[in-house]
Structure formats: C-alpha cells, structure tokens
C-alpha cells in the first residue's frame, strides 16, 4: 500500500534578456532576521495596499528620459522651428543627474548612455544651455568604451545596437561634437550590422534608430493603434511625428504629455498589463487572499476587456498570455484561439515585434500553455511543444543573463505542476526586489509591479503564519504521541512531513482546523500503510476493517475488544477518537454530521489496501483497468479532501459533498496522485514484487508501460484542471475544487523529480527548511 508518503528531513537547522522582465532582482535590499512584526503593522499595510489596488487605474510609472527626449525633439505643427512640447525640454533641463547623465539607474551603463545622448540631441536641436551639454558629453566620452563591449553583465535596452549608433550620426548633423575612440565606433557599427541581420526586417519598434531609411507611412498604416501610437511607445511615435507629421501621432503624444505633466514614460498606456502583473505578484507572494473583493473587481473588468478584444491586451503577446492564464485559472471562460498565431516558434519570432521576442514573453506563453483543459485545445499543446524546448535550450546555452529570470525559468521547467503554494511564496519573497527595474528601450519602474508595501506585508504575513504553523505542528506531535503512533513510525519523521505538506497547500493562517484534520488523515493513512506493509499481519488488518464495519452496521463506535493485539488497539483507537472529534467540530460549523460518510471512506481505503497487498506480483490483477478500479483509493486524496473541506471557512452541504461532481473530481485526483506515485516507485516495487500500474501491464515493454501510465495520468490531470477552472454549471465551491488540485500539485512536487519519495532532491528539502525554519528576510525601516 503506497500512500502520499513524504520526504524525511531534519528539523535541527543551524542558525535578456529584454522585454518586461525585472532586471535588478535578488536579495540586495534584504537583510535577515529583522524585528518582530505585529498584526497592527500588517493591518496598516493591508489598508495601504487595498487603497493602491482600488486606485488601480492610476498606474504609477517612472519617467523615461529617453522617450521624453524624443518627444521633445518633435517640432511644432505650426512652426517647425519651435518644439511642439517645450515642457519636455523643461523636464530634461531639470532632471540631469550629478554625473552629467540622464536615466533611471546608473548601474545600467548602456541605458544611461542612450538616455543621455537622446537628451543631448534634444537640447542641441533647440539650442538650450551649453553647460548641460558639456556635462553630458563628458559622461558619454568617459563611458563609451563600456557601450562598445559585449559584456554579459551589461544589460542593454532593446534596440540599443541600432539606436545608439544612429543617434551618434544625428549628433554629427547637429554639430554636437563627441570625441569617441575609433575602436569604440567601429565596435558599435559592427554590433549594429549584426543586429540588423539578426532581426531580419523586424525593426519597426526601434524605427527612431533608422530615421529616413524607414517607410514611415507604411509603418503607420501597418502598426498604428487606435490611440494613435506606434507600439504604445512615445519614442517611436515621436519619430513618426518628426518624419511624416501624422496628426494621430501628435494627438497621442499630446495625451501622454498632458497625462504625465510634461514628461513621457517608455510605454503608454500599460494599465491592464500593470494590473495583471500586480495580481500575479500578489498571488506569488501569497497575499492575494487578503484582497479578494478588490482583485475580483479587477478580474471582472479585465474579462470585459478580453471579451471586447481590448487593443492593449491583444496587441501585446506578453499581456495577452498573462491575461489568458490568470483569467482561465480564475475560472473565466476564455478561448485560447487568440494565441493561435504563436503555435510555431518560427511564426512567433516572425510575427512579434522586437519588444516581445524575448525569454520573458516565451515564458509567459509556456505558462499559458500549461492551462490546457481538453484535448481539443491544440493551440496550447503546440505552444507548449516549442516553448519548453526553447526555454530549455536558453538555459543550456546560458543566454539568460538575468539571474532571477534564469531561476524562474529553471523552476517552471523542472516541475511546473509541482509548485506548492507556500514553497512558491517563500521563493518569491527571497527573489523579490521592490526597487527592481524593468527594461524596454529604457529602464523603468512601475509601483504596481515592484512595490515595497507588497514585500513588507508578505514578510510580515509569512512570519505570522509560520508562528501559527509551529503551534499546529506541536499539536500534531502531541496528538501523534498520545495515541502511541510515534512508536510505530520507526524513525520516520512523519509529523513534520505530513504537516509541511498540509501547510504548503492550505496556507491561510485562519484555516487551522483544515490543516490539522488534513495532516491527521495523512498520518493515519501512513500508519495503516506501515501496519499493512511492514509491521502487521493480514489478520490484524482485517480486524481493523471488521471494527469499522461494526460502526457502519450499528451506527455507533465500539471500542476494540480486549483480545485484539496492541497494534490493532493503537491504530483503531487513534482512528476512532480522531474521526469522532473531527466530525463533532465539523458538525458545529456546518450543521450536519458527516461521520458515516468518512467512516465509509476509511473502510473503502483499508479494504483496497488489503486487496493491493494481496495482489503481489500482479497475480490477482490482470489489467491496468482492473488495477485502477481500486488502487487509486489507497493514495488517500479523496479522504484527505472530504475531511478538510468542512473547515475551509465556507458553507458546504452533504448533498454537495456526495454529488457526482465532487466525487468525480476526487476520483480524478486519486488517480493523478496514485499514478505519480507509481511512476516514482515502480522500479523499487518491481524488486519488492508489489503490484503497480507499470508492472501490471503484461506483454509490453517497460517503456511502453510507462508511456501508457503517463498517458492515463495526463488525461486525469487534465480532467482535474478542467473541473477546477470551469465554473459554469458547477455546484461545488471553488475552494473545495482547489483543494483537490493543490493535493495533486503536492504529489507532483514530491513525486515529480528523479529518485524516490524518501530521497528527494536537495531543492525540495531546502524549500521545506525555508518554509518552516530558516530566517525570513525583511526590509529595513525608513
């Protein structure tokens, strides 16, 4: 009998990239073991975050010196000798950095060079103060060698190799003297030529770097959005306005400058994308549950945007993939047909503009492809077929220079379905940087994506939850020892294993009884597993089942007879008292008694365990179908879920719990967990001559048998996902359905790696330690 066995670990612990991807992530702003947080502090942060979410349409984004400079270069429609946007020139004059540069982050040298040269061009074009020019020129001349080197640690803005040489040429036209080493100029020109060849005509997004060589009227005809912009880029739109005086381009630029009070961001608008990123961030930090009402309102609005085919979503493949994934997982009816043009790698890179042809965008497509819910969704299957090997190759080639992005790609590729909530929350906390920049044609920050309040509250919330988890673990240990089950574990760290799994999937601090009851079921199943497999006899197993049948027959508990062995008394009494107490607490909350249903489930599980034990070498099981008719029950997914759902903070009914929908969902969950376990352990179980979904298949090779099991697993996993994600026509609360899927994700986590369940990879053990024991980072107060 193989149950949801867990990884033993020690509780004694010594004290590109390009595109919309964070480029300065990591732990640089974090310190370990900060002051003890309070619930009062958390409440203050909750209100601050709630206010920000409620004002979500006001997306705060940093000013772009680069884009502001290009807008400043646009001449007036009435008088070409004057700037159309003098307020942008004022902003440039007022925002030069002390070192003579312009730009958001001095560590991004290529970005600073690009921003600085663009600002110098604007100042020179309109004859503004020379002292600003001199300081800017000195900065460029001092740092130009760093722009001309292919330093893998130097992150370049999108199109830098095309735009920067073009701006140097434009500087000559304006008699702006730059004394640059010939070697640096030659290196920049070689990089430009290489980039032009590599991009194969996909240059429109960086059209300002091509100047008169562009057919601007054709670009406008092909790419102009309803808001008048080109690619929602003020810089590209400004270049178009300079070259062909398009009135819609001017109208867009006027709206941007008016909205931003005299400057331009590097992308506008980005309201929808920023709010999607905010939701994704709050979910990954584990604090979205505190803002359900506010986030649901945003989801409803974005779904309306999706139905109306809002241009901001569908003109941006990154935004579209992210919106699709978040909406589908939330339960909205969204079709994957809109992603059809990205089903092939070549077609993707030929169809998207430069700002989307990056690892970050491909990662979003890969994540979206994992939400496939039926066999007919060939679009998602085809996207998955190329995005996974593409991302894998990027890792092998070490072309992802941004470490946090590299780590995220590694984690998602390794075991996408095995993402345990609390593990992910802690991992995100460790990687999160509230001061991180993102980069397009220049670096920018958006407070809806990287926000200090988010990380502060996440850390405080994690500490509060962890304190509760430690208390609950103590309760579990006492309960386990009270019934003498610790004497049966034979050194297995059972309580810690079971509880970490439970807290990993039921994270909300208020759901204490749900965690405790779920963990108790895991532990009881594990004890009976040991009794049946290791310590007990067939007669003792049957004795326990007989006692349970007595309860079902007489509708009352009956203590184990004196003549029963101590093993029978210990296991039955633990089950007897625990089910009694859990049922009483559930009755008080829900108003009905579910005891008989749970007892029936225990009877079924133990009878199937006996049958599994008696099916050694598969002699009594002739087919895979026959094996699947009983073996999945012994994994315990259904029993764990139907016990814990009473304590999820929602009202449930007996009719719902016994409905065909709920029982079908639990059955699919049982099969997923069972087959994952089988795929992990079939080699060992073959040696032990234990029946398994692989070994039961006769007349085929082991490779064919494994392939068949994986095929069946994929079918049932897709069924679970479909039933969880689809809300239309469902009578089962989302919280109950998610508990089944999260249980499957735990099985994916612990069985989805190489090795067996008792020799898990180092990173899982590290996740466990980080979740329960290691010091949490904190931000210094100021």
Curated annotation (Swiss-Prot):
| Keywords, comma-separated and alphabetical | Lyase, Magnesium, Metal-binding
How does the cofactor attach, per the note? Binds 3 Mg(2+) ions per subunit.
* Pathway annotation: Secondary metabolite biosynthesis; terpenoid biosynthesis
Any keyword Transferase?
no
| Gene Ontology CC terms | chloroplast
Q: Where is this motif: DDXXD motif?
A: 529-533
Give the record's family classification: Belongs to the terpene synthase family.
What domain comment accompanies this record?
The Asp-Asp-Xaa-Xaa-Asp/Glu (DDXXD/E) motif is important for the catalytic activity, presumably through binding to Mg(2+).
What more does the record tell us?
Answer: Abietane diterpenoids (e.g. miltiradiene, abietatriene and ferruginol) accumulate specifically in the periderm of roots. The ent-kaurene diterpenoid oridonin, main constituent of Isodon rubescens, accumulates in leaves.
> What is the protein's name according to its record?
Nezukol synthase KSL3
Name of encoding gene:
KSL3
């Amino acid at each position: 009998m193989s149950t949801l066995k867990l990884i033993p670990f020690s509780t004694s612990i010594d004290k590109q990239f390009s595109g919309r991807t964070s480029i300065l992530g990591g732990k640089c702003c974090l310190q370990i073991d900060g002051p003890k947080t309070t619930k009062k502090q958390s409440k203050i942060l909750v209100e601050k975050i709630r206010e920000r979410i409620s004002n979500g349409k006001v997306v705060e984004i940093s000013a772009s010196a680069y884009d502001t400079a290009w807008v400043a270069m646009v001449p007036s429609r009435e008088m070409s000798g004057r700037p159309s946007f003098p307020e942008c020139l004022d902003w440039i004059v007022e925002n030069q950095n002390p070192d003579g540069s312009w730009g958001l982050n001095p560590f991004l040298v290529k970005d600073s060079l690009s921003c600085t040269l663009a600002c110098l061009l604007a100042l020179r074009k309109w004859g503004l103060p020379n002292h600003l020019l001199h300081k800017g020129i000195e900065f460029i001349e001092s740092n130009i060698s760093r722009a001309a080197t292919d330093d893998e640690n130097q992150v370049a803005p999108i199109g830098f190799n095309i735009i920067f040489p073009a701006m140097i040429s434009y500087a000559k036209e304006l008699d702006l003297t730059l004394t640059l080493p010939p070697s640096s100029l030659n290196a920049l020109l070689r990089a430009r030529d290489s980039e032009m060849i590599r991009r194969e005509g996909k240059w429109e997004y960086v059209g300002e770097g091509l100047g008169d060589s562009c057919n601007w009227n054709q670009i406008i005809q092909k790419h102009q959005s309803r808001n008048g912009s080109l690619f929602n880029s003020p810089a590209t739109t400004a270049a178009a306005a300079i070259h062909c005086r398009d009135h819609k381009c001017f109208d867009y630029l006027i709206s941007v400058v008016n909205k931003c009070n005299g400057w331009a961001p590097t992308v506008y608008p980005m309201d929808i994308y920023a709010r999607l990123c905010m939701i994704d961030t709050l979910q990954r930090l584990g604090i979205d549950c505190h803002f359900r009402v506010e986030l649901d309102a945003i989801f409803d609005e974005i779904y309306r945007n999706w139905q109306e085919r809002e241009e901001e979503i569908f003109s941006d493949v990154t935004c579209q993939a992210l919106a699709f994934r978040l909406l589908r997982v939330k339960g909205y009816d969204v079709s994957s047909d809109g992603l059809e043009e990205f089903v092939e790698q070549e077609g993707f890179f030929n169809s998207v503009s430069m700002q989307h042809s990056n690892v970050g965008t491909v990662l979003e497509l890969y994540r979206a492809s994992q939400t496939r819910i039926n066999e007919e969704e060939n679009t998602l299957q085809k996207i998955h077929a190329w995005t996974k090997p593409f991302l894998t190759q990027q890792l092998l080639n070490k072309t992802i220079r941004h470490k946090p992005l590299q780590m995220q790609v590694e984690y998602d590729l390794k075991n996408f379905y095995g993402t345990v909530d609390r593990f992910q929350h802690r991992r995100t906390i460790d990687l999160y940087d509230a001061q991180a920049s993102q980069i397009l044609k220049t670096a920018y920050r958006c407070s809806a994506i990287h926000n200090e309040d988010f990380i502060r509250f996440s850390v405080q919330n994690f500490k509060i939850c962890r304190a509760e988890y430690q208390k609950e673990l103590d309760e579990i240990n006492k309960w386990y020892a009270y019934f003498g089950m610790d004497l049966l574990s034979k050194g297995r760290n059972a309580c810690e294993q079971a509880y970490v799994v439970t807290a990993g999937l039921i994270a909300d601090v208020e759901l204490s009884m749900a965690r405790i009851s779920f963990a108790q079921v895991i532990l009881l199943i594990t004890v009976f597993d040991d009794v049946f497999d290791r310590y007990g006899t067939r007669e003792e197993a049957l004795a326990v089942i007989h006692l349970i049948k007595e309860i079902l027959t007489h509708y009352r508990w009956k203590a184990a007879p004196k003549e029963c062995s101590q093993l029978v008394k210990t296991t039955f009494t633990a089950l007897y008292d625990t089910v009694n107490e859990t049922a009483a607490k559930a009755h008080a909350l829900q108003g009905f008694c579910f005891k008989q249903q749970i007892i029936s489930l225990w009877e079924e599980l133990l009878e199937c365990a006996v049958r599994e034990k008696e099916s050694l070498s598969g002699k009594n099981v002739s087919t895979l179908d026959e094996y699947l008719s009983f073996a999945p029950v012994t994994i315990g997914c259904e029993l764990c879920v139907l016990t814990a759902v009473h304590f999820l903070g929602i009202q449930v009914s007996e009719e719902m719990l016994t409905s065909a929908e709920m029982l079908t969902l639990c059955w699919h969950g049982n099969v997923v967990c069972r087959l994952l376990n089988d795929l992990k352990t079939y080699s060992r179980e073959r040696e032990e001559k234990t029946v398994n979904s692989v070994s039961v298949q006769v007349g085929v090779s082991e490779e064919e048998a494994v392939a068949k099991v994986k095929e069946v697993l994929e079918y049932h996993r897709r069924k679970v996902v479909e039933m969880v994600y689809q809300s239309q026509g469902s009578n089962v609360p989302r919280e109950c359905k998610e508990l089944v899927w999260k249980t499957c994700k735990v099985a994916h986590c612990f069985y989805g790696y190489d090795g067996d369940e008792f020799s898990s990879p180092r990173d899982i053990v590290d996740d466990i330690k980080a979740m329960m024991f290691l010091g949490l980072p904190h931000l210094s107060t100021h």
